[in-house]
């Protein structure tokens, strides 16, 4: 397995995801989205695997001003705006090769080989 966890250090679900893999002795790479974020290619790949751009956005997040802009701008501009503002992406984003999840989903991770 080649696990990557994209999240923030303050996110409780990200901490729980890290604990899940640590407890099972599974190595993972943590990417702090406040420092690095996701590349456009990574984001598009994860979005496709999880039902599209709209599902990637945490609409209940703290940054309501940015979320309002994303909600009402043209569809072709949304991707760039989300990539510029990684704080609006649901976390954790957990990747294992081409598979990925949004949020804390241990039942899915248990099935990964």
Question: Where are each of the predicted segments found?
Answer:
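Thiol/selenol-based redox catalytic cores and closely related redox-interacting motifs
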Residues: 33-113
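Local sequence-structure signature of Cys/Sec-based thiol-disulfide redox active-site neighborhoods
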Residues: 1-24, 28-33
């Amino acid at each position: 397995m080649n696990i990557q966890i994209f999240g923030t250090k303050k996110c409780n679900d990200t901490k729980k995801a890290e604990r899940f893999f640590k407890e099972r002795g599974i190595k993972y790479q943590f990417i702090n989205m406040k420092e690095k974020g996701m590349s456009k290619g990574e984001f598009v790949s994860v979005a496709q695997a999880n039902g599209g751009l709209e599902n990637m956005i945490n609409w209940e997040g703290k940054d309501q001003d940015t979320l309002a802009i994303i909600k009402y701008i043209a569809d072709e501009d949304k991707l760039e705006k989300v990539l510029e503002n990684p704080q609006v992406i649901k976390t954790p984003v957990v990747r294992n090769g081409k598979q990925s999840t949004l949020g804390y989903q241990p039942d899915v991770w248990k099935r990964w080989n």
